[in-house]
Design a protein with these regions (language model features):
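Conserved ABC ATPase "signature" region
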Residues: 1, 220, 235-253
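Conserved ABC ATPase signature
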Residues: 1, 231-233, 257-261, 265
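Conserved beta-strand-loop-alpha-helix hinge in the C-terminal portion
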Residues: 73-104, 325-326, 334-337
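Catalytic Walker B motif of ABC-type/P-loop ATPase nucleotide-binding domains
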Residues: 19-23, 282-286
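Hydrophobic anchor residue at the start of the ABC signature
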Residues: 8, 271
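Conserved structural motif at the start of ABC-family nucleotide-binding domains
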Residues: 121, 135-138, 254
């Protein structure tokens, strides 16, 4: 919330005539989205401020918007009123993943380097503090093999911190009672022994991934959990990278430099990276972040299909309930301390 509110406040203090915002509602919980909707709506009523919103999710269009210009395949359509746009907006197909691709995912062979424990994650009375602020307090949480969890909560409630513990990225985990894949943290395992079982994507990873490599190399970096590609994959591994890029509909982007892609295309590349090693545990933090409605449907289909396979476990964070796949079996809601 703070990273969103501060630039907005600074901008409004300069008394602008035009306010341009690129996907301002992404990453905000429902309460904060409503507050921002209300704030912008009131500003348009009491000032001469002209608001221009760039939105990848048309469901986020606020009621105070008067006109819409749709953009498709890098081409601007004609200007129309909001009511006209809503009347002609194309319905999203109930399914975007083809039956052929669905069968390919379901028939993927299982690797030989699997863990063999009933519990994937065990947290016992875990507390995390940063300075004077307590982020998590006495949290007990068990994720069993094959479960699919929805992790939710207000902004600042500790969701990202919790995921960093599961991903072995938080140094405070060594002082906590945490067991991952049957191995207690601090018992001699390396973070790479943990990460090899995990496929992960998040907005933070997206913002930090500034490597201007070919898209297929970004996907391949997921094989060894590196930021960048420092070990040339074997031919069969590169074939797996191309396979997953095809599943996500981005095979044509494999030789394009990552930083030259649109934000939505980059997100699809990072999703392919999360799936490329066929992980036992998927950790998806706002996986549909920044995608248009068609690709949101496609990614949701891929997630649901992947999770139908035996012993696949998932933890997914989203601020939009409608984004949760039908395979969700459990939920955890975090409250701000």
């Amino acid at each position: 919330v703070q990273t969103c509110a501060l630039p907005i406040s600074k901008t409004l203090l300069s008394n602008p005539r035009v306010l341009i915002m690129d996907n301002p509602f992404i990453g905000l919980d429902a309460k904060t989205r409503d507050l921002l909707h209300t704030l912008l709506g009131e500003l348009t009523k009491v000032t001469h401020l002209q608001v221009i919103l760039i939105l990848s999710k048309s469901d986020d269009i606020p009621a105070f918007i008067t006109h819409v210009i749709p953009v498709e395949d890098r081409v601007c359509g004609k200007k129309m009123t909001l009511q006209e746009y809503l009347a002609v907006r194309k319905p999203i197909p109930e399914r975007m993943l083809s039956e052929e691709k669905e069968a390919r995912i379901l028939n993927l062979p299982y690797g030989g380097d699997l863990y063999h424990t009933e519990h994937v994650v065990d947290l016992n009375k875990v507390s995390i503090r940063y300075g004077e602020r307590t982020i998590l307090k006495d949290l007990d949480w068990t994720v069993k093999c094959g479960e699919k969890w929805a992790l939710s909560g207000e902004n600042g409630s500790g969701k990202s911190t919790l995921l960093s513990l599961v991903c072995a990225d938080n140094p405070q985990s060594y002082a906590c009672d945490i067991t991952l894949f049957g191995r207690k943290r601090g018992s001699g395992e390396s973070i790479w022994e943990i990460k090899k079982h995990i496929g992960y994507v998040s907005p933070e990873m997206h913002r930090a991934y500034l490597k201007n490599l070919p898209a297929i190399d970004i996907v391949a970096s997921g094989l060894h959990d590196s930021v960048g590609l420092y070990k040339r994959p074997r031919p069969e591994q590169m074939a797996a990278c191309e396979w997953w890029m095809d599943i996500f509909g981005i095979a044509n982007l494999k030789d394009r430099n990552f930083l030259q892609l649109s934000s939505g295309e980059q997100r699809l590349v990072l999703l392919a990276r999360a799936f490329v090693k066929d992980p036992e545990l998927l950790i998806l933090d706002e996986p549909l972040h920044g995608l248009d409605l068609y690709n949101r449907r496609l990614v949701k289909d891929v997630i649901e299909t992947f999770c139908r396979r035996k012993d696949k476990t998932m933890i997914m964070v989203t601020h939009y309930q409608e984004e949760l796949p039908a395979c969700i079996t459990n939920s955890l809601f975090l409250k701000r301390n």
